[in-house]
Amino acid sequence: MTTIFYTEPELVLSHGRKVLFINPNDLQIFKDIEVPADLTTCGFKIEATDEGEPKATCGSNLEVSILNVCYSPDRQLIALTTVGQKALLLYKSRPEHALLLSVRALARASSALAFAPDSSSVLVTDKTGDCYQYDCVEVEAPPKLLLGHLSIVYDIVWTPDLKHIITCDRDDKIRVTNYPATHDIHSYCLGHKEFVSGLALLPGNEGLLISISGDKTLRLWNYLTGKEVLQQQLPAPAVRLQMRELIQSKRYLLAVLFYDHVEAIGLYELELKEAAWSIAKESLVRAEAGSWSISNFALTSDRIYVAGAVNERLTLRVYNSADGKQAESVPAGWLDMVMENFAEQTCVPEDLSAWFKKRYDNISEYMERKKRRIEDQQQQHQK
């Protein structure tokens, strides 16, 4: 899985077993993290079954690959999860080299990752819908099961006041859970008709949440009441969301990656004017969609960094957010230098068609059988 995001002043790009921390202006690499091919060499403990044999899900013979990467709000910690040997790795961020603090086994592959606003713990959701809390101070402490969904969780955010954890899943639900009393659900934000793939809180506007979905909508919610505030139709199902504040508490740029559409990315300016929210401006960025498999993107003040695959090799391209054209100020040689770090690793984008609900039409089959039965009865009466 390819992860890319921007946290000032660094662009973070992850694929395979490597994470790069890049200057977005000249693409010079600040530092990197390379996860060992065998995590047992850095403290990973393989859990044993009742018979004393190692669990296959954590076997050392499986290829290790990074799934999710996250920076702590105080910029002191970096968390990442792996598949193959399923683990949560916690690093101390330093100017030159990140220092590994802990390696903790996960029961199942992760689906989303988020730090607490005070950087004291990290939340990991897995593909069965469970959400665990891992302490970042007492790194040997066992994880706490906080909440669970009945389907895979695609995104998770923790409100700045530490009072609510918000999760979204494949079954089109957005759940607002009280914290620390996570057995108590505060509210649901219901209305999406397909998977909810991304969430974002609006800085400076307490109680407001952005969501995107496979039902081709972007929605603004009051998550405290569960009420929808605004709905914006999209040209295609939405799978990734990035946000940037343009004017403090009043104007935001929302960037959405589309699934299987001629235009790869949509840019929407959300504005508060006369106590009402509206989409003041919208534009589409083609990003050469169709000529390569786009998997993720990051948004900076003036550029869009798009990651994808060409001939099963990781490819990074840069576009201007103002006009959607390829950024000529970024020399191709600089991009090649970044991509060379992943040259030995294949890049096969995730099949996002699996995110959509499988619908079975039993009625049509029943009606067809009934029709044939009536025709057979009529033929018998005619005889």
Swiss-Prot record:
Sorted UniProt keywords: Cytoplasm, Developmental protein, Differentiation, Nucleus, Oogenesis, Repeat, Spermatogenesis, tRNA processing, WD repeat
Family matches, as InterPro entries: Trm82 (IPR028884), WD40/YVTN_repeat-like_dom_sf (IPR015943), WD40_repeat_dom_sf (IPR036322), WD40_rpt (IPR001680)
Subcellular location per the Swiss-Prot or TrEMBL entry: Nucleus; Cytoplasm
Annotated SMART domains: WD40
Tissues where the protein occurs: In testis, it is present at high level in hub cells, a niche for germline stem cells of testis. Ubiquitously expressed in all testicular cells throughout spermatogenesis. Ubiquitously expressed in all germline and somatic cells of the ovary.
SUPFAM superfamilies given in the database record: WD40 repeat-like
Coiled-coil segments on the chain, per record: none
Sequence ranges of the WD repeats: 61-101, 105-144, 148-187, 191-231, 289-329
GO cellular component: a single term: tRNA methyltransferase complex
PROSITE patterns, per the entry: WD_REPEATS_2, WD_REPEATS_REGION
Main location: nucleus
Pathway given in the UniProt record: tRNA modification; N(7)-methylguanine-tRNA biosynthesis
GO biological process, one term: spermatogenesis
Similarity-based family: Belongs to the WD repeat TRM82 family.
Biological role: Required for the Mettl1-dependent formation of N(7)-methylguanine at position 46 (m7G46) in tRNA. In the Mettl1-wuho methyltransferase complex, it is required to stabilize and induce conformational changes of the catalytic subunit. Required for binding of nanos mRNA and repression of translation by the mei-P26-bgcn-bam-sxl complex. May cooperate with mei-P26 and nanos to derepress the BMP signaling pathway. May cooperate with mei-P26 to suppress expression of a subset of microRNAs. May cooperate with mei-P26 to regulate bam expression levels in germline cells during gametogenesis.
Subunit structure, as described in the record: Forms a heterodimer with the catalytic subunit Mettl1. Interacts with mei-P26 and weakly interacts with bgcn; required for the function or formation of the mei-P26-bgcn-bam-sxl complex. Interacts with nanos; may be involved in mei-P26-dependent derepression of the BMP signaling pathway. Interacts with Myc; the interaction may be mediated by mei-P26 and may be involved in the regulation of ribosome biogenesis.
PANTHER family: TRNA (GUANINE-N(7)-)-METHYLTRANSFERASE NON-CATALYTIC SUBUNIT WDR4 (PTHR16288:SF0), WD40 REPEAT PROTEIN 4 (PTHR16288)
Extra remark: Wuho means 'no progeny' in Chinese.
Name under which the protein is recorded: tRNA (guanine-N(7)-)-methyltransferase non-catalytic subunit wuho
Lineage per the UniProt record: Eukaryota, Metazoa, Ecdysozoa, Arthropoda, Hexapoda
